[in-house]
Amino acid sequence: MADLWTNYLLPLLIVIGQSFLLLTVLLITIAYILLADRKIWAAVQIRRGPNVVGPWGLLQSFADLLKMVLKEPTIPSGANKGVFLLAPLVSCVLALAAWAVIPVDAGWMIADINVGVLYILAVSSLSVYGIIMAGWSSNSKYPFLAALRSAAQMVSYEVSIGFVIVCVLLCAGSLNLTAIVEAQNSQYGLLGWYWLPLFPVFVIFYVSALAETNRPPFDLVEAESELVAGFMVEYASTPYMLFVLGEYVAIATMCAMGAIMFLGGWLPPLPIAPFTWVPGVIWFTLKLFFMFFMFAMAKAIVPRYRYDQLMRLGWKVFLPLSLAMVVIVASVLQFAGLAPK
């Protein structure tokens, strides 16, 4: 009985506790990321944004949550009820599952696996199924068209993100997220992070992440002028909220990936005091919000692409460019003797 408790039950309880803590912190962070998105958009348009609920509007996201939960969910009469209700759950759960392997500080993750980057890529690839299920089960033309667009868009840009990951893998010599951060630890501080030597790759990752998460200017899935509200046309109340939550968790995941692969994760910008006095989780959070600020500014400033422009950019520009960068990075590492041992 003692062996059962020590070897199975106690580790299980620890993982459940860690998961609950991560989920709580992540959902609170997402609430303020959503508020930041609205505030940044308002600032660009010279508006105030949400400023009524709580001091400076800080409780606006929680008021929206309460409003959504208290509304009655509606299901179209011709919809496939089971798939219709399962779709937002699939989308949200898969987005949250990716955070199991993301380290917010040294040793601060639920699972430290050696193929963490591949795990995140695989889980984020599966999230398209939630959107396809929503589009098909709604039994409506606009959600179905949006779901088809989303499938094509996400598949197109996952290829570029895959080659970006290969470039980082070549430099770090590992697919372990902690090892990737440690590989960027040098006496040069932020100049030793991968954003500088791999800057073209960083730009490809940033734009591909925008397309992967259906963010403007690549929000063809939710193009209001063409598809009303995209695959979420028939959704209301809690299912709609789960879709929005899944979307913003996926955005936070991509921001965290950018922070880990190119901005040194939890490392301070300079390896000297007083920067080293600040906990690593604070640096990681600041970098995550910096990445999200870039996402939000793209939404506020750049007009939406046409669908043919989106596909052309993915297949005719980013795919050959990312493939060329893999060859260039591998060649430089090999011939300059910089390849990780």
Swiss-Prot record:
Q: What GO terms fall under cellular component here?
A: plasma membrane
- Asked if the Swiss-Prot or TrEMBL record annotates the protein with the keyword Transmembrane helix, the reply is yes
Transmembrane intervals: 13-33, 82-102, 115-135, 161-181, 190-210, 242-262, 277-297, 317-337
Would you say which domain of life the source belongs to?
Answer: Bacteria
Tell me how this protein assembles: NDH-1 is composed of 14 different subunits. Subunits NuoA, H, J, K, L, M, N constitute the membrane sector of the complex.
Keyword Transmembrane present in the record's keywords: the answer is yes
Native species of this protein?
Rhodopseudomonas palustris (strain BisA53)
Q: Which GO terms describe its biological process?
A: aerobic respiration
Q: What is this protein called?
A: NADH-quinone oxidoreductase subunit H 2
Which family is annotated?
Belongs to the complex I subunit 1 family.
Which InterPro entries does UniProt cross-reference here?
A: NADH_UbQ_OxRdtase_su1/FPO, NADH_UbQ_OxRdtase_su1_CS
The protein's location, in the record's own words, is: Cell inner membrane
Membrane topology reported for the UniProt record: Multi-pass membrane protein
Give the EC number(s) under which this enzyme is classified.
Answer: 7.1.1.-
Q: Which UniProt keywords apply?
A: Cell inner membrane, Cell membrane, Membrane, NAD, Quinone, Translocase, Transmembrane, Transmembrane helix, Ubiquinone
Q: What's this chain's function? A: NDH-1 shuttles electrons from NADH, via FMN and iron-sulfur (Fe-S) centers, to quinones in the respiratory chain. The immediate electron acceptor for the enzyme in this species is believed to be ubiquinone. Couples the redox reaction to proton translocation (for every two electrons transferred, four hydrogen ions are translocated across the cytoplasmic membrane), and thus conserves the redox energy in a proton gradient. This subunit may bind ubiquinone.
